Amino acid sequence: MGRQNPSLVIMAEGMGSRFGGLKQIEPADPEGHIIIDFSLFDAWRAGFRDVVFIIKREMEAEFRECFGDRMERYFHVSYVFQELERLPEGISVPAGRAKPWGTGHALACCKGVVTGPFAVINADDYYGRTAVDFLAAQTDESCYADSNEMQA
């Protein structure tokens, strides 16, 4: 039995408060490509076939409009919602907290959707082909974090 193709998990839940909008879907070049387009192109070449977007529920319509048919021709696309209430049993949201918990919580929200090896990227960063190729080629059970290949 061969190794399962890895999933690409894209953290796109950010509130965009400093940017003033959804930076994740803003064009990054004159042709209208967004940063995620470049990451997905590299991911496809590296063998990723499943993409999971971690988003806010209220962003779903915009993401489906932006990525929907265009990306679903190449990838199996899933959307996961990072919601404050999705916490382990016995943990509760502190009064007044409105911001998401962070990366660990975002990945925990993928439980049941991501069932095999995966790589995680931020929607508004471009990591480059070398980084994506490296992550896709891993065959052991290790975890890797490398910011040396990241290009902002």
Whereabouts are the PLM-identified features?
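Polar low-complexity intrinsically disordered regions
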Residues: 1-2, 151
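N-terminal glycine-rich phosphate-binding loop and ensuing alpha1 helix
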Residues: 2-68, 77, 116
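Glycine-rich, phosphate-binding/catalytic loops in enzymes
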Residues: 25-29, 71, 135-139
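Conserved beta-loop-beta/alpha segment of the NTase-like Rossmann-fold superfamily
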Residues: 74-76, 81-152
